[in-house]
Amino acid sequence: MGRWSGFRWLYEIGCGLRVGNRKAAIRAYRDLGIVVGDSIANAITLLDTITVIGGGLAGAHSLFLKHVVDEMNNPLLNMNGEPAQRLEMKAYNLEDVKELDEFLRGETKVITIPGTNKTITHDPLKRTGVGISRLGTGKAVAIGAYAYALSQLGEA
């Protein structure tokens, strides 16, 4: 779990690998997921991107990532107490095989271009994804820098 290893004990308790109050550890990660999900939902309104959780926190994703995405998809209540869609898009847990498949599949439709016999493929599903880093920051930066250098040389 990298630099975040100071909290590895909590992860291990939550997974049943260490003696402790497993229910409390799982609840702590659920609460973390809700807070992180709320923060990402607020930030994602400014950005058109997927979210990648990295560092040591990524190692504990099995205990909180579902709660992050659930919170992002939860509606907010308006002044009348009625639910209002929080995000313009649907958030997907990219670490869940079923959700990843749905994210990648989308809702592709073939539509006719008005005034012609031509058709185009269109995917109207607005979506974002939340996943974890597998490369690590140093390697990801190095790969990005290399790709950028190649593009500047005209070799990419």
How should these model regions be labeled?
Residues 1-156:
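ATP-binding/phosphotransfer module of carbohydrate and carboxylate kinases, centering on a glycine-rich
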